[in-house]
């Protein structure tokens, strides 16, 4: 009883627990049952008394009292009358909070259609009635009648009649012989008279009997909606409203402003219109007004209700007094400002503050400096409690006074309160989980938050005015999670790639680099030291310097933990760093006995973390930081003008290039090359020149000068130190300072031909300065635009992947994907070892030479395995992948592998989907913000040759080469590859060489590292001849299919193939044929004529009658001129891949292996058929004539070969080559974009996203399931249905996976809450309501929305415990029920209640 007295003012009823939420269409009875009364008047409140009008929109009788426990007229006040209804004003005496919960309703005089079911495409009413939207609107808005009961007349059921037709029919057949209705009543009648079961059966018969392609699809849609109504228990006529619910008044408030005016929610205006029109309609009906007036009023009522539900969906937008569209109920849910995204997924938080950040170098890694003022405010409740407990104050009021006066005891108590109470720091934008971390606060004076320098890279923070927010975790659980999971000391590794993120940068790196320098002939060279004490002494006495070569004794630990000492040749500086190393046998002094660049420091921290654990690494990093800062300060490194060394050979190189470009101009003037080729060559020449000058500059800057007398090395160039150590600046920036700025891009992305020859030291000319302004501006504009794009990409990724949670240890799958090293133009860009680290092997990994097992099946591949894999020369390993994981909901731990942020196997309940989305999205923003860092200087990325990285012997696969007139070996095959094998026959590298390249090596040659093995012209694609002969032209008609363009500048003609379609009646197939001595067309070696069909825009390189040799070029197809490869191409490219859009000029992929045949042309397309080798049907492709087809008649293609160049569409790869190939393609393409920017993301993140893009299966055969052929079904739903079929001995459904873009996949998740809060809210909710969908609340988003713990991390454990507890309760109750008498059970149940 005592408890109840205490809680009178805020009675806490336990929130009802639920496991799922169902949404369906509300019936009129349901709406009435929600309502507390009908609203009859449009009035809101009385303007004099400010009391709500009775029966109005704010009526207290319907919605409840305005003040707590007080009726409107004031007769009953206070608690003792709780629950009494005042006889005078009719208001119940209760809490005013009920005004947020109680609903009312409006009874409509005429039914109206619900606009969502009418207009939200596809129109549900339209589909169900099989009528077009246009016809429906004609009926609803009172233009046409519809026949609902034809009687014996020749009229048809559902036939539309205009007013005149209707009157005519009445005259003709008599008034009572048929019934025709108009407006929503008519539609309601049609919907009510539907027999869904019969309709469904009829449609199924129709689908079975239909012959055309389109009809079944249309019928299937209709069948789906009919079955949805049957299954969900919704009745079709409920889509027409007879009652309109009115939401509680406190959710659409009317607030008095100062000056006697009111601010009101738009909903009140919209409701008022509905009530006014409804009342007027009632009155008109009572008055028996003419039909036309009543009809007009009904139409207006329909429009008013439409505007209330979704303003602007149909017809004009209804605007308020200030011409602003009114916010309807639908607008309250939609978009960034709607209920879902503004209030449910993102909330404002109390116990938080924000301030500017400053650097706190004396803090430990787990600390942050919190201003006292902020702490006092944030921890107020804790302080009050502690003051009370210590007896400093008796009441909260007294405590408040003490705190306000800032008495000395308050500060002592604040210290106690804060001790070991972590706070969370957050820097916006929070792009990945490292954007919020927990720290222990240290009280400081001042008003700025102090941040530890090493966590800056995780927050992406700098101290130029950034602000950060502080949040206080209140409950014990929250504090525990903050400490155990979110403490900055737990986030040493980056979740995207597993590399350390607590890495020194800038000054610290510079200090450590300076410390580890070794110089010749310094004082005291060759001295020997026993320990650090001696070294410090010697430095203090100036007997040695930090960079002297000395011999020092380092005491290490061996594998058994015994100490040993060893003498190293080193420097005092390196000994200082070595002193900080934790003692461990796997962390020897060699780790620091080298020049410490940023990369080396990162490797060192990684080594320490892997072997010595977290605690040691944190202490090590902190000490490293102090050492670095101190030595950077002691070194006093800065740079002046003389440090920017302009290379001596610069002008010589520039002159050489100028001569070269003059030569190209001359070739162009002589007509040897085209304008486009000249442009490409000039740009290329300047690009090479810039690089060579940069190399010269780097040589000169990095050269170590010696004192001629003593031979002592001088101080290294400061700029070089900064760049080489990785502290600041890149070679690209140094090139601009002291080399040559190089080529610039126009805003369009084209490169300007004339480069900037000056550098910043020399200063730019006016012309050069003007050319360079493009890049700078484009950079700034790009940044602004791309930040938004990147944020949107992250949002879509999170939405598609949020359900991927680790839900079981091992799914037991034996499938996986094959991993190989990624080689790009001969360079190994991602080694096999780096790709398989932290993944699980599907099969034993065996060393090829000895047959030893390196990694047993089902074991995770760790660092120590990697060394052996690298040595053994294994080419391919099959590993488990989330793509082939068989877990129903979520993913299993074994398929996922290592948790990159911890370096251990992934924990149960880890939200790997969100981590993947963040890892891919975060650099997106980074990259976009970094576009202009090179100041728009164009970076060319065109290769025209292949060099090998390995020594060995050359093997040529698919060797098909010819010697051309110049005696070069020319590649004639489409799939020729050069393989370099080492002495024991292991393949070291495979280079695909493109058609038309000139080979520099041949079968059996030996090659050295860096030797060029092939080269080609990067600007044109050649068409080569395979036989010798004399040239003849076919269908090359001047002015129709070929134009002789005379270049104005040179006066020389060149022949270009043009599009003959533009000339009427000309069906020309331009080609070059080769004729033998007898004048007949030569035959190719593999049969077929030597006829080369020419694509549009090909430039012909030969003349008729000319004699040429095999391997010579007959025509060239120009490539697009070089554009700068910037991440600008990158971000849209990544989005395009994840959205699975078909590229503009998609490649055409062979679906089967077979022989190519060309058939008759079809209009403006060429017909290409592949006759399969194995037998079966031939496949036909129609290819536009402008596309260059590589193949000749009779060529043999493999399944999956490209028939036409271009970017392949991912859907085709999936259909032809399967899931593994698709995943490999997407992973490689996306990685390429990030790699270009030097961003490292682990493959598994991309795989997680791709898994979610493959959620749906398209059924080839629905078997005996409830699905239809060709329908797209969720993978899990299909598996469940097939299990049911197997149990019943029926035929299961079969299908093939389909690829959906991330937006589409997010909208088709099983959870309608998640989809509705993502995009297209109206459509998602409409569809869910019609289907009577149940949201099982499995994902993260749904649970955040309904305010429960998310089913990941600690929430997953809580869920598990709840499930176990429930099942245990059921068990106990069941056993109790068996043992005792039934009556007893009833009694005990009552007692429990």
UniProtKB/Swiss-Prot annotation:
UniProt entry keywords in alphabetical sequence: DNA-directed RNA polymerase, Magnesium, Metal-binding, Nucleotidyltransferase, Transcription, Transferase, Zinc
Cofactors: Mg(2+); Zn(2+)
Ligand binding (Mg(2+)): 462, 464, 466
UniProt KW RNA-binding keyword: no
Any Pfam family matching the protein: RNA_pol_Rpb1_4
Organism of origin: Azorhizobium caulinodans (strain ATCC 43989 / DSM 5975 / JCM 20966 / LMG 6465 / NBRC 14845 / NCIMB 13405 / ORS 571)
UniProt remark on cofactor binding: Binds 1 Mg(2+) ion per subunit.
HAMAP family named in the record: RNApol_bact_RpoC
Annotated GO biological process: DNA-templated transcription
Signal sequence, start to end: none
PANTHER family registered for this protein in UniProt: DNA-DIRECTED RNA POLYMERASE (PTHR19376), DNA-DIRECTED RNA POLYMERASE SUBUNIT BETA (PTHR19376:SF54)
Coiled-coil regions listed in the entry: none
Primary role: DNA-dependent RNA polymerase catalyzes the transcription of DNA into RNA using the four ribonucleoside triphosphates as substrates.
Gene Ontology cellular component terms for the protein in this record: DNA-directed RNA polymerase complex
Record note on quaternary structure: The RNAP catalytic core consists of 2 alpha, 1 beta, 1 beta' and 1 omega subunit. When a sigma factor is associated with the core the holoenzyme is formed, which can initiate transcription.
Family according to the record: Belongs to the RNA polymerase beta' chain family.
Gene that this polypeptide is encoded by: rpoC
Reactions that this protein is recorded to catalyse: RNA(n) + a ribonucleoside 5'-triphosphate = RNA(n+1) + diphosphate
GO molecular-function terms, A-Z: DNA binding; DNA-directed RNA polymerase activity; magnesium ion binding; zinc ion binding
Binding, Zn(2+) 2: 811, 885, 892, 895
Protein name, per record: DNA-directed RNA polymerase subunit beta'
């Amino acid at each position: 009883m005592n408890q109840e007295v205490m809680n009178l003012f805020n009675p806490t009823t336990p929130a009802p627990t639920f496991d799922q939420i169902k949404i369906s269409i509300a019936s009129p009875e349901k709406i009435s049952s929600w309502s507390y009364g009908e609203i009859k008047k449009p009035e809101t409140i009385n303007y004099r008394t400010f009391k709500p009008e009775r029966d109005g929109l704010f009526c207290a009788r319907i919605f409840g009292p305005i003040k707590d426990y007080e009726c409107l007229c004031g007769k009953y006040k206070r608690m003792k009358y709780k629950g009494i209804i005042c006889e005078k004003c009719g208001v119940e005496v209760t809490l005013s909070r009920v005004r947020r919960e109680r609903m009312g309703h409006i009874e409509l005089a005429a039914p109206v259609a619900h606009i969502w079911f009418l207009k939200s495409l596809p129109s549900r009413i339209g589909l169900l009635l099989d009528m077009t939207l246009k016809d429906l609107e004609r009926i609803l808005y009172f233009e046409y009648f519809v026949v609902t009961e034809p009687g014996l007349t020749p009229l048809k059921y559902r036939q539309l009649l205009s007013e005149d037709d209707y009157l005519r029919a009445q005259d003709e057949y008599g008034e009572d012989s048929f019934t025709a209705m108009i407006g929503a009543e008519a539609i309601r009648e049609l919907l009510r008279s539907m027999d869904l079961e019969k309709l469904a059966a009829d449609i199924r018969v129709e689908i079975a009997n239909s012959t055309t392609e389109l009809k079944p699809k249309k019928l299937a849609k209709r069948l789906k909606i009919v079955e949805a109504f049957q299954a969900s228990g919704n009745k079709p006529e409920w889509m027409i409203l007879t009652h309109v619910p009115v939401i509680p008044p406190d959710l659409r408030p009317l607030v008095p402003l100062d000056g006697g005016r009111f601010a009101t929610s738009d909903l009140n205006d919209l409701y008022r219109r509905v009530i006014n029109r409804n009342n007027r309609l009632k009155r008109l009906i009572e008055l028996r007004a003419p039909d036309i007036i009543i009809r007009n009023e009904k139409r207006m009522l329909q429009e008013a209700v439409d505007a209330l539900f979704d303003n602007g969906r149909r017809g004009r937008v209804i605007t308020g007094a200030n011409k602003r569209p009114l916010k309807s109920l639908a607008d309250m849910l939609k978009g960034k400002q709607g209920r879902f995204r503004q209030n449910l997924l993102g909330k404002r938080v109390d116990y938080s503050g924000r301030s500017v950040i400053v650097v706190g170098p004396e803090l430990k890694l787990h600390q942050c400096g919190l201003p006292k003022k902020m702490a006092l405010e944030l921890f107020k409740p804790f302080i009050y409690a502690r003051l009370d407990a210590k007896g400093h104050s008796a009441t909260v009021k007294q405590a408040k006074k003490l705190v306000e006066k800032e008495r000395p005891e308050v500060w002592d108590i604040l210290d106690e309160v804060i001790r070991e109470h972590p706070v969370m720091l957050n820097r916006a934008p929070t792009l990945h989980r490292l954007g919020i971390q927990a720290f222990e606060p240290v009280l400081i004076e001042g008003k700025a938050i102090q941040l530890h320098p090493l966590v800056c890279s995780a927050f992406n923070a700098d101290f130029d005015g950034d602000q950060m927010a502080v949040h206080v975790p209140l409950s014990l659980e929250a504090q525990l999670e903050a400490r155990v999971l979110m403490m900055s000391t737990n986030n040493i590794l980056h979740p995207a790639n597993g590399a350390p993120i607590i890495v020194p940068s800038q000054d610290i790196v510079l200090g450590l680099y300076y410390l580890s320098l070794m110089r010749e002939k310094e004082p005291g060279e060759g001295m020997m030291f026993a320990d650090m004490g001696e070294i410090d002494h010697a430095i203090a006495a100036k007997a040695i310097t930090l960079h002297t070569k000395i011999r020092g004794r380092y005491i290490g630990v061996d594998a058994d933990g015994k100490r040993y000492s060893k003498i190293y040749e080193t420097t005092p500086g390196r000994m200082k760093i070595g002193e900080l190393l934790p003692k461990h046998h796997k962390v020897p002094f060699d780790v620091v006995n080298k020049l410490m660049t940023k990369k080396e420091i990162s490797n060192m921290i990684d080594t320490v973390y892997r072997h010595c654990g977290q605690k040691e690494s944190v202490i090590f990093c902190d000490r490293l930081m102090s050492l670095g800062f101190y030595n950077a300060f002691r070194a006093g490194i800065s740079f002046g003008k003389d440090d920017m060394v302009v290379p001596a050979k610069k002008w010589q190189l520039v002159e050489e290039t100028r001569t070269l470009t003059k030569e190209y101009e001359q070739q162009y003037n002589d007509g040897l090359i085209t304008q486009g080729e000249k442009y490409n060559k000039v740009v290329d020449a300047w690009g090479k020149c810039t690089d060579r000058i940069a190399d010269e500059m780097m040589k000169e800057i990095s050269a170590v000068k010696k004192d001629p007398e003593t031979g002592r090395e001088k101080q290294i160039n400061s700029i070089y130190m900064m760049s080489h150590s990785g502290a600041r600046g890149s070679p690209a920036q140094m090139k601009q300072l002291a080399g040559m700025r190089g080529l610039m891009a126009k805003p369009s992305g084209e490169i300007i031909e004339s480069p900037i020859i000056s550098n910043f030291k020399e200063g730019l000319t006016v012309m050069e300065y003007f050319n360079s302004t493009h890049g700078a501006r484009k950079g700034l504009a790009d940044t602004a635009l791309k930040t938004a794009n990147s944020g949107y990409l992250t949002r879509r990724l999170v939405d598609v992947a949020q359900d991927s949670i680790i839900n079981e240890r091992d799914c037991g799958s034996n499938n996986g994907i094959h991993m190989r090293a990624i080689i790009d133009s001969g360079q190994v860009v991602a080694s096999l070892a780096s790709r398989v680290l932290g993944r699980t092997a599907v099969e034993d990994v065996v060393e090829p030479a000895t047959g030893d097992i390196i990694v047993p099946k089902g074991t995770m591949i760790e660092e120590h395995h990697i060394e052996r894999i690298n040595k053994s020369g294994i080419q391919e390993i099959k590993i488990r992948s989330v793509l082939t994981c068989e877990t129903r909901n979520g993913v299993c731990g074994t398929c996922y592998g290592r948790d990159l942020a911890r370096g251990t196997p992934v924990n149960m309940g880890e939200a790997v989907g969100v981590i993947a989305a963040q890892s891919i999205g975060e650099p997106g923003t980074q990259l976009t913000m970094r576009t202009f860092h090179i100041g728009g200087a164009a970076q060319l990325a065109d290769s025209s040759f292949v060099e090998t990285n390995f020594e060995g012997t050359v093997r040529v696969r698919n060797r098909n080469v010819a010697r051309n007139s110049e005696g070069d070996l020319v590649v004639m095959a489409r799939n020729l590859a050069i393989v370099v094998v080492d002495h024991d026959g292991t393949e070291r590298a495979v280079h695909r060489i493109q058609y038309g390249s000139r080979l520099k090596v041949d079968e059996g040659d030996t090659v050295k590292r860096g030797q060029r093995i092939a080269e080609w012209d990067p600007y044109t694609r050649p068409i080569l001849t395979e036989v010798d002969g004399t040239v003849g032209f076919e269908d090359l008609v001047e002015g129709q299919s070929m134009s002789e363009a005379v270049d104005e500048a040179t006066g020389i003609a060149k022949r270009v193939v043009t599009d003959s379609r533009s000339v009427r009646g000309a069906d020309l197939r331009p080609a070059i044929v080769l004729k033998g001595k007898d004048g007949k067309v030569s035959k190719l070696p593999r049969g077929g004529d030597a006829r080369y069909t020419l694509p549009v825009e090909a430039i012909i390189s030969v003349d008729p009658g000319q004699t040429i040799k095999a391997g010579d070029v007959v025509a060239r197809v120009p490539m697009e001129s070089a554009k700068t490869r910037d991440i600008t191409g990158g971000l849209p490219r990544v989005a395009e891949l994840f959205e699975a859009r078909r590229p503009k000029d998609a490649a055409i992929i062979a679906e089967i292996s077979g022989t190519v045949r060309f058939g008759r042309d079809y209009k403006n397309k060429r017909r290409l058929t592949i006759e399969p080798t194995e037998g079966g049907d031939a496949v036909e492709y129609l290819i536009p004539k402008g596309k260059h087809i590589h193949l000749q008649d009779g060529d043999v293609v493999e399944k999956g070969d490209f028939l036409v160049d271009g970017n392949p569409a991912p859907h085709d790869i999936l259909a032809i080559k399967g899931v593994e190939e698709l995943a490999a393609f997407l992973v490689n393409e996306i990685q390429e974009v990030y790699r270009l920017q030097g961003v490292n993301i682990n493959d598994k993140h991309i795989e997680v996203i791709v898994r979610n893009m493959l959620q749906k299966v398209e059924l080839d055969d629905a078997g005996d399931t409830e699905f239809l052929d060709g329908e797209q079904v969720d993978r899990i739903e299909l598996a469940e249905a097939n299990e049911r079929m197997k149990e019943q001995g029926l035929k299961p459904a079969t299908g093939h996976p389909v690829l959906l873009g991330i937006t589409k996949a997010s909208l088709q998740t099983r959870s309608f809450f998640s989809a509705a809060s993502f995009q297209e809210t109206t459509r998602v909710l409409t569809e869910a309501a019609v289907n009577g969908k149940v949201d099982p609340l499995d994902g993260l988003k749904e649970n955040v929305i309904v305010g429960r713990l998310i089913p990941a991390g600690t929430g997953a454990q809580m869920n598990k415990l709840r499930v176990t507890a429930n099942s245990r309760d059921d068990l106990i109750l069941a056993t109790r029920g068996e043992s005792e008498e039934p009556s007893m059970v009833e009694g005990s149940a009552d007692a429990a209640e």
